[in-house]
């Protein structure tokens, strides 16, 4: 990943229960959207692309 995504996702996932999984999905979403919401959760309206990405089951993909 890029240093932008790594640093943003490091913050985003700092309190996640499953750190590696959080970082993986955050990284995928960041690469696609070039945006990661601030804070450790919520604030997804800052990044509509990130907010609206869904996985194959139709659930939100991005942490």
Swiss-Prot record:
<dbReference type="InterPro" id="IPR003854">
    <property type="entry name" value="GASA"/>
</dbReference>
<comment type="similarity">
    <text>Belongs to the GASA family.</text>
</comment>
<keyword id="KW-0020">Allergen</keyword>
<dbReference type="Pfam" id="PF02704">
    <property type="entry name" value="GASA"/>
</dbReference>
<protein>
    <recommendedName>
        <fullName>Peamaclein</fullName>
    </recommendedName>
</protein>
